[in-house]
A protein has these predicted regions:
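Amphipathic alpha-helical interaction/coupling elements
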Residues: 129, 157, 161, 200, ...
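Hydrophobic alpha-helical membrane-association signature
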Residues: 50, 92, 126, 201, ...
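Alpha-helical/coil-rich non-catalytic "connector" segments in signaling and regulatory proteins
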Residues: 1-156, 334, 338-401
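Short amphipathic alpha-helical segments
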Residues: 40, 159, 170-173, 202, ...
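Signal-transducing coiled-coil/dimerization helices and immediately adjacent hinge/linker segments
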Residues: 139-190, 339, 360
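Glycine-rich, flexible loop segments associated with nucleotide phosphate handling
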Residues: 116-124, 204, 245-252
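Cytosolic nucleotide-utilizing catalytic cores of signal-transduction proteins
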Residues: 172, 178-179, 183-184, 194-198, ...
Length: 401
């Protein structure tokens, strides 16, 4: 064994101790070790073992054995069984990798740049075998989650993993016997106010997940009764190029809105699987710009093509304030915002708009004239369409409440 490996072996207990201390310092869930010395000792033992196996196997680039991988998986099981969260699991893996690389760097620096061949050997070994170890650890972790968590909570964890780019998503999907698609539509259903009664929509979400077989998670809004249902709906690759939402998304949104019984708004954004974290932010912004709809199956998911003007306006306060002033000027009239909404939703077809409002076409005409009187803007003009349709959507989205 060369001098780099000898130095790593000499420093293994010290470096393992430093790793345990880093867990205590940087990961809050590990602070319970202060009262659980056995757990701390077991982690110390594992950290020393992993460093020694690195030193034993890397000189001739030998792989971790099946027994090694089973031991690593068992550590993942122990930590999951102790209640470690997925976020902490990810922190542990990142911190461990960073510290192992620091161990190697410090050992090489202590030799003043010598033993380059040994440094290349250990680094060549570390990347592929580190990946195998991480996979084994994740699989052990998921084994316990599958045993401990109810089905809907497993699905919610899969949704969160997909939306944060956590590699554990593949293991969770396999445990649920689901195949991860190449493309998805991230859908955010915004619910400003949950139904009365104090329940947390568990039944509605469980029904939705089992019916549509999609990962979904409820995210409550702090300090309110509202929140978001976020679903990851598989779609075909061509859906990314279409301006409308996939049919599967529309079906899911309609089912949830009907079961919810409260006004809600939905936004959706499509993306390849590895770009879901960014598409979540887009879908969330779209849902905040979309109008709140009545709780029926007719609630539809909005896309960027539907509300791109409103998205832009929301980022320009001076324009948003002007539109808000136009909206306030409509307040003296009879149901003018609702009337304009129907008028534009029916492509300015007077007969269809009047029928949807259950009024006579002449009543519709009167209301449109009243809009022009109050705002100085003709609803049927190009300027009126551009301005008043945006006013209506902003008002119905709840942006100005």
């Amino acid at each position: 064994m060369g001098s780099l490996f000898a130095e790593l072996a000499r420093q293994a207990p010290t470096n393992a101790y430093r790793e345990v201390e880093a867990y205590l310092r940087e990961i809050p869930e590990f602070r319970s070790w202060e009262t659980k010395p056995r757990a701390r000792a077991e982690t110390m033992e594992y950290s020393v073992w992993l460093r020694r196996r690195t030193i034993e196997l890397s000189p001739d680039n030998s792989e971790l054995t099946d027994d090694d991988l089973r031991y690593i998986a068992a550590i993942g099981e122990v930590r999951a069984d102790a209640g470690m969260s997925s976020d902490s699991r990810q922190q542990v893996l990142q911190l461990h990798t960073r510290l192992m690389l620091r161990d190697i760097q410090e050992a090489a620096e202590s030799l003043r740049g010598g033993e380059v061949e040994e440094l290349m050997q250990v680094m060549t070994w570390f990347a592929p075998q580190g990946d195998r170890g991480i996979v084994a650890y994740r699989q052990g972790f998921v084994t316990v989650l599958r045993r401990r968590l109810p089905y809907v909570e497993q699905v919610a964890l899969l949704a969160r993993s997909l939306l944060t780019g956590d590699p554990m998503a593949a293991d969770l999907a396999a445990a649920l016997d689901w195949e991860l698609p190449e493309f998805c539509a991230v859908t955010v259903i915004r619910v400003p106010d949950r139904p009365l009664g104090g329940h947390d929509l568990d039944i509605e979400i469980e029904t939705l997940v089992k019916t549509h077989r999609v990962p979904a998670v409820w995210c409550p809004e702090r300090g309110t009764r509202g929140g978001e249902l976020i679903a990851v709906v598989p779609c075909a690759d061509e859906a990314i190029r279409l301006p409308s939402a996939p049919d599967a998304v529309a079906d899911l949104v309609g089912d949830f809105a009907e079961a919810l019984g409260r006004p809600c708004a939905a936004g959706t954004a499509t993306a390849p699987l590895d770009e879901l974290p960014a598409s979540l932010e887009r879908a969330r912004r779209i849902s905040k710009s979309a109008p709140l709809g009545k709780p029926t199956r007719r609630v539809r998911p909005y896309t960027m093509a539907d509300v791109f003007v409103e998205l832009a306006v929301a980022d320009v306060p001076v324009i948003d304030a002007w539109l808000h002033a136009v909206a306030r000027s409509l307040e003296p009239g009879p149901d003018l915002v609702t009337t304009l909404d129907a008028y534009y939703c029916h492509d300015m077809n007077r007969g269809a708009a009047a029928a949807s409002l259950n009024v006579h076409p002449r009543t519709l005409d009167y209301r449109l004239r009243r809009v022009a009187e109050l705002t100085g803007i003709d609803p049927g003009s190009a300027h009126g369409i551009r301005t008043l349709s945006t006013v209506v959507t902003r008002r119905l989205s709840g942006a100005w409440t």
